């Protein structure tokens, strides 16, 4: 079973590390090509392209400039500990045991605009380059054209290595669009999280993102290997709704807190 999640815009390079083990990203040659393109952008161009403030654009221009191909614990940190968004609040990787990290390293992958695919312990230098950004490059008009089949092929390698054919899609649509489902040697299961609001169940972005992290943690902590085991997920009040679920889509609901 291979879990896919999105990266986060918020990064943490200050907190104490809970493991000293690390690996290196497997697609750095591609990352270096994107950095070459990104370095051509001025801060105002970055601001327009990413729809971010001038201050953030300046920070990210500096990150592109400072990025170097030699990754060490001195200039990078493990991806699963560097990302700090809503998904990672639910995941709480900073509390993982070494055995948890081992399982995650085999069964969890983070999709990334710059790095393509990251394993949890892969070192990562700070960046911001969302998958949906239209950064022109030698391979096309955006990052989807840049990555082509590369991400899908890397995921197929991971599936083959564990002798499995199930992908748990906990990534956002923006990121999963970088995967070619028809070329993926796997059955794709997509958990959906609905929260009650004024008597109706719907996807509420903040809660749904955190729930994706909670589900990832549930799989890792319990060493789950079969998709049917996911129906036991009950973190923070969620429950499986079989009637609303269908082939390939598992629906979890949570009542409004009153």
Curated annotation (Swiss-Prot):
Keywords in alphabetical order: Cytoplasm, DNA-binding, Stress response
Gene Ontology BP terms: response to hydroperoxide
Pfam family, one: H2O2_YaaD
The keyword Cytoplasm belongs to this UniProt entry's keyword annotation: yes
Organism: Escherichia coli (strain K12)
Protein's recorded name: DNA-binding and peroxide stress resistance protein YaaA
Lineage start: Bacteria, Pseudomonadati, Pseudomonadota, Gammaproteobacteria, Enterobacterales
Motif mapping: Helix-hairpin-helix: 35-66
Domain writeup: Has a wedge shape with a highly basic apical cleft (a cantaloupe fold), where DNA might be able to bind.
Entry-linked NCBIfam families: PRK02101.1-1, PRK02101.1-3
């Amino acid at each position: 079973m291979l879990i896919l999640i999105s990266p986060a815009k918020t990064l943490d390079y200050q907190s104490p590390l809970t493991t000293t083990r690390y690996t290196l990203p497997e697609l750095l040659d591609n990352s270096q090509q994107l950095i070459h393109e990104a370095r051509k952008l001025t801060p105002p161009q970055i601001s327009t392209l990413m729809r971010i403030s001038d201050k953030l654009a300046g920070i990210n221009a500096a990150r592109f400039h400072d990025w170097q191909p030699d990754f060490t614990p001195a200039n990078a940190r493990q991806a699963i500990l560097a990302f700090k968004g809503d998904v990672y609040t639910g995941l709480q990787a900073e509390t993982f045991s070494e055995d948890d990290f081992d399982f995650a390293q085999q069964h969890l992958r983070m999709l990334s605009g710059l790095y393509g695919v990251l394993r949890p312990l892969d070192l990562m230098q700070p960046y911001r380059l969302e998958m949906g950004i239209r950064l022109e490059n030698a391979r096309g008009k955006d990052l989807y054209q840049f990555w082509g089949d590369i991400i899908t092929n890397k995921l197929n390698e991971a599936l083959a290595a564990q002798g499995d054919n199930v992908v748990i899609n906990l990534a956002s649509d923006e990121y999963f669009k970088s995967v070619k489902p028809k070329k993926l040697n796997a059955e794709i299961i997509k958990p959906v999280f609905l929260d009650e609001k004024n008597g109706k169940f719907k996807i509420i972005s903040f809660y749904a993102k955190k729930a994706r992290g909670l589900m990832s943690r549930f799989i890792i902590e319990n060493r789950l290997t079969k998709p049917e085991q996911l129906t036991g997920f009950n973190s923070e009040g969620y429950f499986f709704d079989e009637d609303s679920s269908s082939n390939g889509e598992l629906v979890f609901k949570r009542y409004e807190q009153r």
